[in-house]
Amino acid sequence: RMGETICVSWLKQYNIPVKIVRPFHTYGPGMALDDGRVYADFIADIVNNRDIVMQSDGSAMRSFCYLADATIAFFLVLLNGINGEAYNVGNSDCEISILNLANKLVSLFPEKGVKVVTKNTQNINYLKSAVSRNCPDMTKINNLGWYPKTKINEGFYKTINSYEKIL
């Protein structure tokens, strides 16, 4: 939020037009599969025919927004947003637990024979998110007329297929 504060300060002090977007778990073709985000790890596992090994109980809830939808939202905010305002960009219709996401991704590519493996997470040292649910309030950007179009199955299928074509 420090960047947002600096931008709004420039708006107020120098009248520099500023609009702020807050992307929520945006994914799609071209994303780095080694960036440490759980869904990037899951995609890399499927692309490389590896089982998905859960590093937590998978109960954290997240909403995912396909890159093409997010890009349209970014431009809409740039062109029609109010200076100094922040707009959440996400897909509140695509909220899913991390465990259910792993199972869903595996089910999209049954021919790969990949499965979800759960560990006993009682004694495991993993970075646990302090946020158990992260679903954006989309009211402000919806008021600009933006609604994401891509469902989670379609978006992740396209994303994984894009990496399959590269390999």
Regions found by a protein language model. Name each.
Residues R1-E4, G36-A40, S63-F64, E95:
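Short-chain dehydrogenase/reductase
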